[in-house]
């Protein structure tokens, strides 16, 4: 399901199903005729009855096993997911962000639990094999005690509230993955250096809820012990995007750069040790990889391969009756973190 008139097909997550063993695309839905035609061409659907202008009609007529909610605009994400679950689909693959509010997230979770529908989010960076290597390095004690997980958004024109909602899911998901579920939050949102007030909130782009602030800083107490930090400042001024997160330990640190190759680097010393050089070593899919570079690497193809792993995880979750790695409860947690940031930033009012 896409909405070409309002946000398009996101990061082309529908194409992740093309060529997957055991999966066949049987129908597409869009809200404009050209969108339907383009989607049918992508998925080689030749029967006119396989293209719909009304996604509800598609659910009723086709009764698919899996629905991909691809719209970049999240205004209808919750409605679509609930309707799909109530229609009896076995799985839902959804573009991030998840939904607009914790209330909507709770409703989606309830609907999916009632129908035993599995839902996975397209948080594809979690599925990069390098992330498993990072977990192994932490478990092997290479970082010592993990003290902090520091994350930043892309800090472009979306810096602040929009960055939190649109890019935040990737780094906040990894924060929780490595540091544990959030237990508490402290946050400040400012506009031109002044704390935001309720009057500063405006509707966000692409269906995200009311947002405010050109700069956000937030701290989260994480269940496994470390403190998580998220920050985003509009137009921070760096040509190289700040997007990513750093894991700080007593013996070493790891820096993660989502969407890049190498995706992570290890330094065998804590961040504050400067008495001699400690080089950053690339981390590969099977361990430290000093010679790993991005030469000859198609980043788009790599990212798509991680997305297909997310699809495979959803399929396996359906077949084995388990929760996917970045499933609806992950989406609920991320939505709770976003709402907590603004709730805490307004405490001073």
Stretches found by the model and what they are:
Residues 1-44:
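N-terminal Rossmann-like dinucleotide-binding module
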Residues 23-25, 146, 182:
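Core-facing hydrophobic residues within beta-strands of well-ordered domains
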Residues 24-26, 299, 317-334:
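Glycine- and charged-residue-rich phosphate/anionic-cofactor binding loop of Rossmann-like
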Residues 31-34, 238, 299-311:
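Active-site loop of classical SDR/Rossmann-like NAD(P)-dependent oxidoreductases
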Residues 46-112, 306:
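Beta-loop-alpha module in the N-terminal Rossmann-like domain of NAD(P)-dependent dehydrogenases
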Residues 90-93, 98-162, 166-171:
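A contiguous active-site-proximal alpha/beta segment in oxidoreductase catalytic domains
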Residues 170-269, 308-324, 338-342:
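Contiguous beta-strand/loop segments that form the cofactor/metal-binding neighborhood of enzyme cores
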Residues 347-349:
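Conserved small/polar residues in nucleotide/adenosyl-binding loops
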